[in-house]
């Protein structure tokens, strides 16, 4: 479970499946967008070998070379996405989920009809440019993790009940059931209607808002990849404080002009101080003063049924690992845990088989990084919650499970 080098490139290719015409190519290096492009001959070869397999009824999903992992994915027999990553320790699970998020982002911006019934390639290329900012965020070193976990990134506000009550009242006053409050792409509070949004739009909408340049207000047309892939909705955003945005998903009404300053002030001025207290909750998902063990460097908590997660890095006197390294280590550990120790729930056929041959499901696992690092990672699952911790080298190995269990019990009332 290595830590990739600073300049490890990732390339994403999007092609029309029938013709092989490239629609776009996006790249990143060291987590930042890059202008580096793959030669057309390489693009043609990667698409050609995939099409060759399809003609022989062979499904080519992934391949590995000495230093690169390649994953192919075809969507609706119309769009082919290919991702190449030279990052050390990159898993196929991460790349597969990235491709699903990328296609979801494309549907979110241009709609499914434009992607499955391509009439004009050049026009589609231009329309897809609006999705580049969102797509590039999947290639970089994001502070979010919903693209990998397929859970909504959340934070826990200090006065959550008051915010929830105000949000519900505001939603009723504006006549829309889908309202949320976001800080840096994470959900602070949301109405029941917003929480009922399907995947992937439940993850994509906050991620989209977090990837856009700051604006006081927006009226943004979006399609819902799961709920409404062919009919657009309106995503209205209003900035309450810098970095803190109110989002409404609605139809033709209300018009943006109806959300005037007087209406906003009436609902949100009484909560000004609690709103300000939410601003630091971007990088740290937990309210200030929440008791966590001093050895905890970072954590990921998932509610597997609600599809929500908390992803936070804790302040530490130690300079190493950096917050970016901690996020990367936890992301890599999650892919290991999800593919090896805590796989997704089995389907009906698998459950039937399990009744005959019951399998033992693990409750916890841990990993010690080395040599010379000593950082420890532990995962524990209790019921519908899964907790992953990154711990300092000072933590005794025999106490990892106990510490993780106590931490999970303390966090359970929050998520």
UniProtKB/Swiss-Prot annotation:
Assigned protein family: Belongs to the fuzzy family.
Quaternary structure annotation from Swiss-Prot or TrEMBL: Component of the CPLANE (ciliogenesis and planar polarity effectors) complex, composed of INTU, FUZ and WDPCP. Interacts with CPLANE1. Interacts with CPLANE2.
PANTHER family registered for this protein in UniProt: INTRACELLULAR TRAFFIC PROTEIN-RELATED, PROTEIN FUZZY HOMOLOG
GO molecular function, one term: phosphatidylinositol binding
A Pfam family it matches: Fuz_longin_2
Top-level taxonomic group: Eukaryota
Gene: Fuz
Localization per record: Cytoplasm; Cytoplasm, Cytoskeleton; Cytoplasm, Cytoskeleton, Cilium basal body
Provenance organism: Mus musculus
GO cellular component terms, semicolon-separated: cilium; cytoplasm; cytoskeleton
Protein name: Protein fuzzy homolog
GO-annotated biological processes: anterior/posterior pattern specification; aorta development; cardiac septum development; cilium assembly; coronary vasculature development; embryonic body morphogenesis; embryonic digit morphogenesis; embryonic neurocranium morphogenesis
Function statement: Probable planar cell polarity effector involved in cilium biogenesis. May regulate protein and membrane transport to the cilium. Proposed to function as core component of the CPLANE (ciliogenesis and planar polarity effectors) complex involved in the recruitment of peripheral IFT-A proteins to basal bodies. May regulate the morphogenesis of hair follicles which depends on functional primary cilia. Binds phosphatidylinositol 3-phosphate with highest affinity, followed by phosphatidylinositol 4-phosphate and phosphatidylinositol 5-phosphate.
Main subcellular location: cytoplasm
Keywords: Cell projection, Cilium biogenesis/degradation, Cytoplasm, Cytoskeleton, Developmental protein, Protein transport, Transport
């Amino acid at each position: 479970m290595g830590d990739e080098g600073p300049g490890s490139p990732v390339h994403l290719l999007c092609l029309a499946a029938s013709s092989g015409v490239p629609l776009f190519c996006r790249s990143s290096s060291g987590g930042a967008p890059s202008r580096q492009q793959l030669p057309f001959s390489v693009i043609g070869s990667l698409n050609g070998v995939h099409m060759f397999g399809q003609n022989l009824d062979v499904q080519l999903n992934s391949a590995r070379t000495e230093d690169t992992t390649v994953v192919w994915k075809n969507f609706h027999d119309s769009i082919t996405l290919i991702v190449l990553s030279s990052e050390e320790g990159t898993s196929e699970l991460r790349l597969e989920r990235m491709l699903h998020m990328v296609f979801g982002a494309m549907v979110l911006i241009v709609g499914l009809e434009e992607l499955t019934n391509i009439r004009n390639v050049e026009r589609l290329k231009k329309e897809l440019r609006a999705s580049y900012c969102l797509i590039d965020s999947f290639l970089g070193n994001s502070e979010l993790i919903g693209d990998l976990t397929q859970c909504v990134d959340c934070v826990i506000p200090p006065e959550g009940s008051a915010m929830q009550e105000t949000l519900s009242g505001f939603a009723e006053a504006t006549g829309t059931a889908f309202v949320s409050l976001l800080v840096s792409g994470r959900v602070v509070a949301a109405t029941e209607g917003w929480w009922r949004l399907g995947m992937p739009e439940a993850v994509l909408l906050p991620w989209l808002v977090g990837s856009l340049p700051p604006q006081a207000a927006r009226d943004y047309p979006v399609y819902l990849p799961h709920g409404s892939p062919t009919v657009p909705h309106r995503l209205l955003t209003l900035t309450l404080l810098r970095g803190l945005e109110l989002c409404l998903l609605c139809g033709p009404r209300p018009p943006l002009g109806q959300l005037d300053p007087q209406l906003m002030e009436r609902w949100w001025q009484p909560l000004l101080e609690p709103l300000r207290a939410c601003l630091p909750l971007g990088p740290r998902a937990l309210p200030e003063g929440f008791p966590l063990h001093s050895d905890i460097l970072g954590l990921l908590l998932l509610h597997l049924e609600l599809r929500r997660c908390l992803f936070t890095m804790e302040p530490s006197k130690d300079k190493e690992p950096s917050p970016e390294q901690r996020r990367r280590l936890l992301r890599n550990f999650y892919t290991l845990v999800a593919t090896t120790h805590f796989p997704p729930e089995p389907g009906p056929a698998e459950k039937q088989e399990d009744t005959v041959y019951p399998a033992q499901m693990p409750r916890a696992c841990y990993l010690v990084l080395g040599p010379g690092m000593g950082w420890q990672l532990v995962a524990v699952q209790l019921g519908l919650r899964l907790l992953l911790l990154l711990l300092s080298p000072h933590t005794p190995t025999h106490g990892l499970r106990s510490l993780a269990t106590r931490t999970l019990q303390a966090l359970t009332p929050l998520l």
